[in-house]
Amino acid sequence: SPALDDEHNDNFLRL
C-alpha cells in the first residue's frame, strides 16, 4: 500500500 509507505506517506497525509 503506497499510502502506508513512508516514501509515499506524504501523499496520504496530503489529503
UniProtKB/Swiss-Prot annotation:
Asked whether the UniProt record includes Secreted among its keywords, one would answer yes
Q: Which residues carry this modification: Leucine amide?
A: 15
One GO biological-process annotation of the entry reads: neuropeptide signaling pathway
The record's subcellular location field reads: Secreted
User: Could you name the Gene Ontology cellular component terms for this entry?
Assistant: extracellular region
What are the record keywords, sorted?
Amidation, Neuropeptide, Secreted
The organism's superkingdom is given as Eukaryota
Sum up the protein's function in the record's words.
FMRFamides and FMRFamide-like peptides are neuropeptides.
Which family does the similarity line name?
A: Belongs to the FARP (FMRF amide related peptide) family.
The protein in question is named: Extended FMRFamide-12
Its source organism is: Striatophasma naukluftense (Gladiator)
